Amino acid sequence: MSITAEKKQEVIQSNARAEGDTGSPEVQVAILTSRIQTLTEHFKSHHKDNHSRRGLLMMVNKRRSLLDYLKKKDVERYNALIQKLGLRK
């Protein structure tokens, strides 16, 4: 249900603002998005797994709050990130 270390490093490198950046909101949102997508696939075959569903909802809420923070601080970075990750239609 979690993402592999290689996948996580790939996500970090593709969204980092600078070398070694792991804490910026963009990277955190990208990692959460990857984990959310993995859990969404998990629920297609395990629809009664309510314990993991709670974790999914917490991740979605954390991502939402990080996106709200980024939108408040820098709208251009926010728009670029949601475009890159395909979060809005």
UniProtKB/Swiss-Prot annotation:
Bias (Basic and acidic residues) ranges: 1-10
GO MF term set: rRNA binding; structural constituent of ribosome
Keywords associated with the record: Ribonucleoprotein, Ribosomal protein, RNA-binding, rRNA-binding
The keyword Ribosomal protein is assigned to this record: yes
Region of interest called Disordered, as start-end residue ranges on this chain: 1-24
InterPro entries: Ribosomal_uS15, Ribosomal_uS15_bac-type, uS15_NS1_RNA-bd_sf
Record GO biological process: translation
Classification via Pfam families: Ribosomal_S15 (PF00312)
GO cellular component entries: cytosolic small ribosomal subunit
Function: One of the primary rRNA binding proteins, it binds directly to 16S rRNA where it helps nucleate assembly of the platform of the 30S subunit by binding and bridging several RNA helices of the 16S rRNA. Forms an intersubunit bridge (bridge B4) with the 23S rRNA of the 50S subunit in the ribosome.
HAMAP family reported for this sequence: Ribosomal_uS15_B (MF_01343_B)
Assembly and interaction partners: Part of the 30S ribosomal subunit. Forms a bridge to the 50S subunit in the 70S ribosome, contacting the 23S rRNA.
Family statement: Belongs to the universal ribosomal protein uS15 family.
The protein, known as: Small ribosomal subunit protein uS15
Organism: Novosphingobium aromaticivorans (strain ATCC 700278 / DSM 12444 / CCUG 56034 / CIP 105152 / NBRC 16084 / F199)
Gene name per UniProt: rpsO
